[in-house]
Amino acid sequence: MRVIDSHTAGEPTRLVVEGGPDLGPGSLIEKAACLEAEHMDFCASVVLEPRGHDAIIGALLLPPSQPDCAAAVIYFNNLQNLGMCGHATIGLAVTLAHMGRIDPGRHKFETPVGIVEVDLQDANTVSVVNVESYRLHKDVTVEVPGHGKVTGDVAWGGNWFFLVKESPFDLTLENVPALTAYTKTIRQALENAGVTGTDCAWIDHIELFGPPKDPFAQSRNFVLCPGGAYDRSPCGTGCSAKLACLAEDGVLAPGEDWIQESVIGSTYRISYQPGTTKGVIPTITGQAFVTSDAHLIFNPADPYRFGIRPQNWTTSWITRTLSVEHG
Protein backbone atom coordinates (compact mmCIF):
# COMPACT_ATOMS: atom_id res chain seq x y z
CA MET A 1 0.00 0.00 0.00
CA ARG A 2 1.56 3.29 -1.10
CA VAL A 3 0.97 6.36 1.06
CA ILE A 4 2.25 9.92 0.89
CA ASP A 5 2.35 11.89 4.13
CA SER A 6 2.11 15.64 4.55
CA HIS A 7 1.35 18.15 7.26
CA THR A 8 -0.78 21.27 6.98
CA ALA A 9 0.00 23.90 9.61
CA GLY A 10 1.32 21.05 11.74
CA GLU A 11 -1.62 18.65 11.30
CA PRO A 12 -0.72 15.40 9.48
CA THR A 13 -2.49 13.83 6.50
CA ARG A 14 -1.79 10.37 5.09
CA LEU A 15 -2.96 9.98 1.49
CA VAL A 16 -3.54 6.38 0.38
CA VAL A 17 -2.45 6.43 -3.26
CA GLU A 18 -2.47 2.69 -4.03
CA GLY A 19 -3.67 -0.47 -2.32
CA GLY A 20 -6.91 0.67 -0.70
CA PRO A 21 -10.05 -1.48 -0.42
CA ASP A 22 -12.49 -2.08 -3.25
CA LEU A 23 -15.57 -0.02 -2.40
CA GLY A 24 -17.60 -1.26 -5.33
CA PRO A 25 -19.77 0.80 -7.68
CA GLY A 26 -22.00 3.68 -6.70
CA SER A 27 -21.69 7.31 -5.73
CA LEU A 28 -18.95 8.69 -3.53
CA ILE A 29 -21.48 8.91 -0.68
CA GLU A 30 -22.21 5.20 -1.10
CA LYS A 31 -18.51 4.39 -1.24
CA ALA A 32 -17.91 6.39 1.94
CA ALA A 33 -20.72 4.47 3.64
CA CYS A 34 -19.15 1.20 2.49
CA LEU A 35 -15.76 2.27 3.84
CA GLU A 36 -17.23 3.05 7.26
CA ALA A 37 -19.45 -0.04 7.42
CA GLU A 38 -17.02 -2.65 6.14
CA HIS A 39 -13.46 -1.33 6.14
CA MET A 40 -12.73 0.51 9.37
CA ASP A 41 -10.04 -2.09 9.95
CA PHE A 42 -8.28 -0.65 6.90
CA CYS A 43 -8.70 2.88 8.27
CA ALA A 44 -7.35 1.95 11.69
CA SER A 45 -4.38 0.11 10.19
CA VAL A 46 -3.43 3.16 8.15
CA VAL A 47 -3.67 5.84 10.84
CA LEU A 48 -3.11 4.16 14.21
CA GLU A 49 0.09 3.03 15.90
CA PRO A 50 2.46 1.40 15.10
CA ARG A 51 2.30 2.92 11.58
CA GLY A 52 0.77 6.21 12.66
CA HIS A 53 -0.90 7.88 15.63
CA ASP A 54 -4.34 9.15 16.54
CA ALA A 55 -3.77 12.67 15.17
CA ILE A 56 -3.29 11.47 11.58
CA ILE A 57 -6.15 12.03 9.18
CA GLY A 58 -6.35 9.46 6.41
CA ALA A 59 -7.41 10.29 2.87
CA LEU A 60 -8.34 7.60 0.36
CA LEU A 61 -7.64 8.80 -3.18
CA LEU A 62 -10.22 7.64 -5.74
CA PRO A 63 -10.93 8.35 -9.41
CA PRO A 64 -13.41 11.22 -9.84
CA SER A 65 -16.86 10.56 -11.28
CA GLN A 66 -17.20 14.17 -12.48
CA PRO A 67 -15.18 15.04 -15.60
CA ASP A 68 -14.25 18.50 -14.27
CA CYS A 69 -12.81 17.15 -10.99
CA ALA A 70 -9.12 16.35 -10.54
CA ALA A 71 -9.71 13.69 -7.87
CA ALA A 72 -12.21 12.16 -5.49
CA VAL A 73 -11.36 11.59 -1.84
CA ILE A 74 -12.80 10.08 1.32
CA TYR A 75 -11.36 11.37 4.58
CA PHE A 76 -11.21 9.24 7.73
CA ASN A 77 -9.72 9.12 11.19
CA ASN A 78 -9.25 6.29 13.67
CA LEU A 79 -13.00 6.07 14.37
CA GLN A 80 -15.05 7.06 11.34
CA ASN A 81 -15.30 8.83 8.02
CA LEU A 82 -15.12 12.61 7.93
CA GLY A 83 -17.45 14.39 5.54
CA MET A 84 -14.83 17.02 4.81
CA CYS A 85 -11.41 18.01 6.14
CA GLY A 86 -9.91 21.40 5.37
CA HIS A 87 -6.31 20.71 6.34
CA ALA A 88 -6.34 17.38 4.49
CA THR A 89 -7.71 19.06 1.36
CA ILE A 90 -4.80 21.49 1.44
CA GLY A 91 -2.48 18.51 1.94
CA LEU A 92 -4.18 16.63 -0.91
CA ALA A 93 -3.60 19.49 -3.35
CA VAL A 94 0.06 19.84 -2.38
CA THR A 95 0.57 16.07 -2.59
CA LEU A 96 -1.06 15.79 -6.02
CA ALA A 97 1.22 18.59 -7.21
CA HIS A 98 4.20 16.74 -5.71
CA MET A 99 3.12 13.68 -7.73
CA GLY A 100 2.86 15.75 -10.91
CA ARG A 101 -0.89 15.18 -11.22
CA ILE A 102 -1.94 18.83 -10.98
CA ASP A 103 -0.31 22.17 -11.76
CA PRO A 104 -0.73 25.52 -10.01
CA GLY A 105 -4.19 26.94 -10.60
CA ARG A 106 -7.80 26.10 -9.77
CA HIS A 107 -9.00 22.51 -9.34
CA LYS A 108 -12.06 20.68 -8.04
CA PHE A 109 -12.15 17.65 -5.72
CA GLU A 110 -15.12 15.42 -5.03
CA THR A 111 -15.85 14.78 -1.34
CA PRO A 112 -18.79 12.97 0.29
CA VAL A 113 -20.34 16.33 1.25
CA GLY A 114 -19.93 17.95 -2.16
CA ILE A 115 -17.44 19.37 -4.62
CA VAL A 116 -14.68 21.47 -3.10
CA GLU A 117 -12.63 23.96 -5.13
CA VAL A 118 -8.97 24.66 -4.47
CA ASP A 119 -6.47 27.19 -5.77
CA LEU A 120 -2.93 25.84 -5.76
CA GLN A 121 -0.97 29.08 -5.55
CA ASP A 122 2.51 27.57 -5.35
CA ALA A 123 4.13 24.29 -4.32
CA ASN A 124 2.92 24.67 -0.73
CA THR A 125 0.17 27.31 -0.53
CA VAL A 126 -3.46 26.40 -1.17
CA SER A 127 -6.80 28.16 -0.84
CA VAL A 128 -9.80 25.89 -0.32
CA VAL A 129 -13.33 27.02 -1.14
CA ASN A 130 -15.30 24.84 1.24
CA VAL A 131 -18.87 23.62 1.13
CA GLU A 132 -21.59 25.98 2.37
CA SER A 133 -21.38 26.28 6.15
CA TYR A 134 -23.99 27.47 8.62
CA ARG A 135 -24.91 27.91 12.26
CA LEU A 136 -27.73 25.69 13.48
CA HIS A 137 -28.10 26.94 17.07
CA LYS A 138 -26.76 30.01 18.91
CA ASP A 139 -25.97 30.15 22.63
CA VAL A 140 -26.72 26.56 23.62
CA THR A 141 -26.00 26.01 27.33
CA VAL A 142 -25.18 22.65 28.89
CA GLU A 143 -24.18 21.66 32.41
CA VAL A 144 -20.60 20.35 32.36
CA PRO A 145 -19.53 18.37 35.45
CA GLY A 146 -16.82 20.21 37.34
CA HIS A 147 -17.20 23.36 35.25
CA GLY A 148 -20.81 24.46 35.60
CA LYS A 149 -22.75 25.92 32.70
CA VAL A 150 -20.95 26.15 29.35
CA THR A 151 -22.46 28.05 26.42
CA GLY A 152 -21.60 27.66 22.75
CA ASP A 153 -22.90 27.58 19.20
CA VAL A 154 -23.72 24.51 17.11
CA ALA A 155 -22.46 24.96 13.55
CA TRP A 156 -21.64 22.93 10.45
CA GLY A 157 -18.46 23.47 8.44
CA GLY A 158 -18.25 20.08 6.74
CA ASN A 159 -18.31 18.43 10.19
CA TRP A 160 -20.37 19.31 13.27
CA PHE A 161 -18.88 21.67 15.87
CA PHE A 162 -19.73 23.08 19.27
CA LEU A 163 -17.93 26.42 19.42
CA VAL A 164 -17.17 27.91 22.85
CA LYS A 165 -15.95 31.51 23.02
CA GLU A 166 -14.08 31.16 26.30
CA SER A 167 -11.85 28.60 27.99
CA PRO A 168 -10.95 28.18 31.67
CA PHE A 169 -7.45 27.22 30.51
CA ASP A 170 -4.96 29.22 28.46
CA LEU A 171 -4.78 27.82 24.92
CA THR A 172 -1.17 26.61 25.01
CA LEU A 173 0.63 23.37 24.26
CA GLU A 174 1.40 22.99 27.96
CA ASN A 175 -2.33 22.88 28.67
CA VAL A 176 -3.24 20.33 25.98
CA PRO A 177 -3.99 17.54 28.53
CA ALA A 178 -6.33 19.82 30.50
CA LEU A 179 -7.92 21.22 27.33
CA THR A 180 -8.46 17.71 25.98
CA ALA A 181 -10.11 16.51 29.19
CA TYR A 182 -12.29 19.63 29.35
CA THR A 183 -13.52 19.38 25.76
CA LYS A 184 -14.20 15.66 26.12
CA THR A 185 -16.38 16.48 29.12
CA ILE A 186 -18.23 19.11 27.08
CA ARG A 187 -18.82 16.63 24.27
CA GLN A 188 -20.22 14.08 26.70
CA ALA A 189 -22.45 16.74 28.26
CA LEU A 190 -23.86 17.61 24.83
CA GLU A 191 -24.57 13.95 24.19
CA ASN A 192 -26.22 13.52 27.59
CA ALA A 193 -28.39 16.59 26.96
CA GLY A 194 -29.45 15.37 23.53
CA VAL A 195 -27.85 18.31 21.71
CA THR A 196 -27.14 17.27 18.12
CA GLY A 197 -26.68 18.57 14.63
CA THR A 198 -29.23 18.22 11.86
CA ASP A 199 -30.94 14.81 11.69
CA CYS A 200 -29.59 13.90 15.14
CA ALA A 201 -25.98 14.04 13.91
CA TRP A 202 -23.34 13.59 16.60
CA ILE A 203 -21.44 16.78 17.41
CA ASP A 204 -17.99 15.24 17.26
CA HIS A 205 -15.75 18.34 17.29
CA ILE A 206 -15.43 20.79 20.19
CA GLU A 207 -13.73 24.12 19.50
CA LEU A 208 -12.52 26.58 22.14
CA PHE A 209 -11.42 30.15 21.46
CA GLY A 210 -9.18 32.62 23.22
CA PRO A 211 -6.91 35.62 22.60
CA PRO A 212 -4.14 35.07 20.01
CA LYS A 213 -0.41 35.11 20.65
CA ASP A 214 0.30 36.27 17.07
CA PRO A 215 -0.23 40.06 16.85
CA PHE A 216 -1.61 39.66 13.32
CA ALA A 217 -4.23 37.07 14.32
CA GLN A 218 -7.74 37.76 15.55
CA SER A 219 -8.23 34.56 17.55
CA ARG A 220 -6.57 31.38 18.82
CA ASN A 221 -8.33 28.03 19.02
CA PHE A 222 -8.15 24.51 20.40
CA VAL A 223 -10.07 21.79 18.57
CA LEU A 224 -10.93 18.35 19.93
CA CYS A 225 -11.29 15.84 17.08
CA PRO A 226 -13.64 12.82 17.10
CA GLY A 227 -10.99 10.28 18.04
CA GLY A 228 -9.79 12.26 21.05
CA ALA A 229 -6.74 13.89 19.47
CA TYR A 230 -6.37 17.65 19.19
CA ASP A 231 -5.97 19.49 15.89
CA ARG A 232 -2.51 20.94 15.42
CA SER A 233 -3.81 23.22 12.67
CA PRO A 234 -6.50 25.90 13.09
CA CYS A 235 -8.91 23.28 11.60
CA GLY A 236 -10.38 24.08 8.20
CA THR A 237 -13.90 22.82 8.87
CA GLY A 238 -13.79 24.43 12.31
CA CYS A 239 -12.78 27.73 10.70
CA SER A 240 -15.70 27.32 8.31
CA ALA A 241 -18.10 26.83 11.21
CA LYS A 242 -16.50 29.84 12.91
CA LEU A 243 -17.03 31.98 9.80
CA ALA A 244 -20.72 31.05 9.74
CA CYS A 245 -21.04 32.34 13.31
CA LEU A 246 -19.01 35.50 12.67
CA ALA A 247 -21.11 36.29 9.61
CA GLU A 248 -24.44 35.76 11.34
CA ASP A 249 -23.33 37.87 14.31
CA GLY A 250 -22.25 40.71 12.01
CA VAL A 251 -18.65 40.59 13.26
CA LEU A 252 -16.99 39.89 9.88
CA ALA A 253 -18.04 41.27 6.50
CA PRO A 254 -17.99 39.23 3.26
CA GLY A 255 -14.49 39.16 1.76
CA GLU A 256 -12.84 40.46 4.94
CA ASP A 257 -9.85 38.43 6.14
CA TRP A 258 -9.65 36.78 9.55
CA ILE A 259 -6.40 35.21 10.77
CA GLN A 260 -7.11 32.15 12.88
CA GLU A 261 -4.29 30.84 15.06
CA SER A 262 -4.04 27.26 16.29
CA VAL A 263 -2.97 25.99 19.69
CA ILE A 264 0.55 25.39 18.31
CA GLY A 265 0.74 28.88 16.79
CA SER A 266 0.18 28.03 13.10
CA THR A 267 -2.32 30.14 11.17
CA TYR A 268 -4.90 30.10 8.38
CA ARG A 269 -6.18 33.12 6.52
CA ILE A 270 -9.94 32.74 6.21
CA SER A 271 -12.81 34.69 4.67
CA TYR A 272 -16.28 34.05 3.28
CA GLN A 273 -18.89 35.02 0.73
CA PRO A 274 -22.64 34.75 1.32
CA GLY A 275 -24.05 31.28 0.68
CA THR A 276 -26.80 30.38 -1.72
CA THR A 277 -29.18 29.17 0.99
CA LYS A 278 -28.68 29.71 4.72
CA GLY A 279 -24.96 30.03 5.29
CA VAL A 280 -21.59 31.15 3.99
CA ILE A 281 -19.06 29.90 1.45
CA PRO A 282 -15.72 29.82 3.31
CA THR A 283 -12.26 30.19 1.82
CA ILE A 284 -9.37 28.73 3.85
CA THR A 285 -5.76 29.50 2.92
CA GLY A 286 -2.84 27.60 4.43
CA GLN A 287 0.39 25.78 3.67
CA ALA A 288 1.22 22.08 3.50
CA PHE A 289 4.48 20.20 3.10
CA VAL A 290 5.09 16.62 1.95
CA THR A 291 6.99 14.69 4.62
CA SER A 292 7.29 11.13 3.28
CA ASP A 293 6.49 8.77 0.41
CA ALA A 294 6.29 5.20 1.66
CA HIS A 295 4.79 1.74 1.35
CA LEU A 296 2.94 0.24 4.30
CA ILE A 297 3.67 -3.44 4.86
CA PHE A 298 1.15 -5.86 6.40
CA ASN A 299 3.10 -8.89 7.60
CA PRO A 300 0.90 -11.86 8.62
CA ALA A 301 3.28 -12.56 11.51
CA ASP A 302 2.92 -9.03 12.92
CA PRO A 303 0.48 -9.12 15.87
CA TYR A 304 -0.16 -5.37 15.44
CA ARG A 305 -0.56 -5.32 11.67
CA PHE A 306 -4.16 -4.13 12.19
CA GLY A 307 -3.10 -1.27 14.47
CA ILE A 308 -3.17 -0.94 18.23
CA ARG A 309 -6.88 -0.65 19.00
CA PRO A 310 -9.74 -2.14 21.02
CA GLN A 311 -10.03 -5.90 20.63
CA ASN A 312 -13.62 -5.81 19.39
CA TRP A 313 -12.72 -4.07 16.15
CA THR A 314 -12.99 -6.27 13.08
CA THR A 315 -10.16 -7.03 10.72
CA SER A 316 -12.12 -8.17 7.70
CA TRP A 317 -10.50 -6.11 4.97
CA ILE A 318 -6.86 -6.83 5.79
CA THR A 319 -7.64 -10.47 6.61
CA ARG A 320 -9.22 -10.90 3.18
CA THR A 321 -6.37 -9.02 1.49
CA LEU A 322 -3.68 -11.07 3.21
CA SER A 323 -5.45 -14.33 2.39
CA VAL A 324 -5.39 -13.38 -1.30
CA GLU A 325 -1.84 -12.04 -1.35
CA HIS A 326 -0.26 -14.74 0.80
CA GLY A 327 -2.47 -17.73 0.08
Swiss-Prot record:
Q: What is its EC number?
A: 5.1.1.8
Question: Key word Isomerase present in the record?
Answer: yes
Catalytic site: 85 (proton acceptor), 235 (proton donor)
What's the catalysed reaction? trans-4-hydroxy-L-proline = cis-4-hydroxy-D-proline
Q: Which InterPro entries match?
A: Pro_racemase_fam (IPR008794)
- One family from Pfam that matches here is Pro_racemase
Keywords recorded for this protein, A-Z: Isomerase
MF term (GO), any: 4-hydroxyproline epimerase activity
Q: Which residues are involved in binding substrate? A: 86-87, 205, 231, 236-237
Fetch the PANTHER family from UniProt: TRANS-3-HYDROXY-L-PROLINE DEHYDRATASE
Which family does the record claim for this protein? Belongs to the proline racemase family.
| Physiological role | Catalyzes the epimerization of trans-4-hydroxy-L-proline (t4LHyp) to cis-4-hydroxy-D-proline (c4DHyp). Displays no proline racemase activity.
**The name this protein goes by in its record:** 4-hydroxyproline 2-epimerase
